[in-house]
Amino acid sequence: MVAPVNGIASALQQMQAMAAQAAGGASPATSLAGSGAASAGSFASAMKASLDKISGDQQKALGEAHAFEIGAQNVSLNDVMVDMQKANIGFQFGLQVRNKLVSAYNEIMQMSV
């Protein structure tokens, strides 16, 4: 039972690190002094890194599934299923982030100046 808890803790730690990276990884006092372009660049790079990781996880899962289908001896069904679920969770997370960004954009566009 320790392995699933470690997996959840690891996923939570990764999400917190991504949130810190998206926030610029700086304290509020230093982020106020920074320029808007630097914040936009760090957000864009964090978003690209997240999308690349999601894509990589999906490619890895598909590769393992294909290897299992052709009968590779070093790939078990458990590994395939776990990697497929990790890829699915990552995709769902990315989809929710996208939905929140679109919602925030629409809300900003509807604000009166």
From Swiss-Prot:
Its main location: other. It is found in: Bacterial flagellum basal body. GO terms for molecular function: cytoskeletal motor activity; structural molecule activity. The keyword DNA repair does not apply. One of its GO terms (biological process) is bacterial-type flagellum-dependent cell motility. Belongs to the FliE family. HAMAP family: FliE. This is Flagellar hook-basal body complex protein FliE. The lineage of its organism: Bacteria, Pseudomonadati, Pseudomonadota, Betaproteobacteria, Burkholderiales. The gene is fliE.
